[in-house]
Amino acid sequence: MKLNRRMFLATTTSAAVLTALAACAKNGSGSSGSTAGVPTAAPEELQDGGTLRFGIGSAPANWNAATVDGNVVDVSLVMKFVSPFVVDWAADGKATPNPDFLTKLEAAEVGGKTVVTVAVNEKATWGNGRKWDSEDIKVFFDHVKDPSYSWATVEGLDKVEKVEIVDKQTAKVTFNSVYPDWSNALAGVTPRELMADAKTFNESMAGATKFNNDYFAGPFKIKSYDESKQVITLERNDKWWGATPKLETVTLHVLDDSALGQAFANKEIDVLDYIFSADVYQQASGRDDAEVRQNTGLQWRHIMFNASSGPLADKAVRQAIVRACDREAIAASDLAVLPVDAKKTLLGNRFFLPVQEGYQDNSTSWGHDVEAAKKLLDGAGWVAGSDGVRAKDGTKLELVMTIPSNAPVATNEANLLQKQLGEVGIKLSVSTVEIDKYFPEYINKKNYALTAFTSEKTQYPLANVGQYYASTSQSNYTGLSVPEVDQHVAKIGSTPDGAERNKLANELDKILWENVFNIPIYQRMQLTAVPKTLRNFGAQGLASFRPERIGYVKS
């Protein structure tokens, strides 16, 4: 999950089905035809050349997307152009290997364990000129359990028991049990040079100017990062062995959220993904050469708690905040004027989206109820003072919500929550911090009390259930450690039956509601504005994209 899924192996783990789903596509196609969100075109219909310009929220704090600081949506976007994503996902979430990277990805159940045979394409080449080999796979997994490596999450990766070298291109990966989401653990390949030691892994690409193309292998490479203009420029990778990209360059411009809509309207950027405000939607709709494409979104908005100290360490306080929080009002305000029914976007589940098998609304006992919130606080000994603010043992119930600068959605949510919590005797102040420091200095270091941000799901609903919630995860921003949560995370990861996994996930979600790790608010529908002539890219939904296929139709 990225600070960001349909499980394609949700209902079976038979060897036959595992192998069939992972069978290599003969023609190398990972798409399933045009959708409303992604109009397609054949290569011969597209221009050779052109630039695609994105807006992003901040420059990368770390170009290694596997690290805590690099595990953000903006870095993930860059990586989709320059780094190997060896699995393609179609619009229905089904996966097939990308033959530019892999010639085999097959799984079987052997002795109660999932065993996967992986063969890399002998043409695949790292940026340093070295060919891929099976050692890259083995060395990667050799370091997964090393705590000195700053992993964002090792969930799934840590289930690999051993990696055996079959030949120069082929490795056999054995998991410690039957593992339905095995392909998620093998969806990328990392050069062994980046895994050399913890310092290299953690720090060699820490900083906006410290990218290193030696560690990448994709249709594009990073040409530059202009610090003064805050622009990342990607160019065609001269070591790329696949089809020549149709685009010549891709640029990513660091912009405040508040500036994105106008930048798109002014034709300064070409992609406006996940439009989430009325003003921005109107700006995008007004651009004469553009259109807004729509699809099921993977992003979800939530309020996060730091429960490691202070009043929020009291579960009753967290529960009272849930009951005082009017999620429907927040969603309606955030999504006003957009072509979206806010009520239908409310999310009652942390793992499944409403369109996915396994979804059930587990929030029904935690709806907006001011009187219930007051009773929780009364029962926990928080007494209202003459100023209306509650206190206990001389400590006032005062909290600070930390939000990034120039983030209108977060500002709106903070203002609404401030009023809602005030009704039950909780004083909420708002602290706005520099967006570049928001995650590395505040959230990652648990230097906050409350916050709200967007996460992005993947095609695997249950692949990283412990990322925010397991006591050992570096991305557990709450500081909470609940044994029952850890037990369910472990069970979900080792249960082969899809229906049983879904049941366990919903049990876990109910435990998370009870303990209030966070508050899911709503799912963002994917509204993406792009030029009308752009093909093979748009509102992707569950589908991945091939960077080399993106282009503009010939005039």
Segments (PLM) and residue ranges:
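Extracytoplasmic/peripheral linker and loop segments enriched in polar/acidic and small residues
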Residues: L9, E45, E423, K427-F439, ...
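Long beta-strand-rich cores associated with HINT superfamily self-processing modules
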Residues: T35, T528-S555
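Gly/Pro-rich hinge or "lid" segments in bacterial periplasmic/extracellular proteins
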Residues: V73, K80, A90-D92, G188-P245, ...
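Append "and occasionally in soluble cytosolic enzymes with long acidic Gly/Pro-rich linkers
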Residues: E235, A313-K419, E507, K554
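Surface-exposed binding/hinge segments that line
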Residues: Q47, V154-T200
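Ligand/substrate-recognition segments at binding pockets and active sites
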Residues: E227-K229, V383-K457, G498
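N-terminal lobe/hinge region of extracytoplasmic solute-binding protein
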Residues: G55-E109, D142, Y215-F216
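Ligand-site clamp/hinge motif
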Residues: R236-Q283, K427-S429, E434
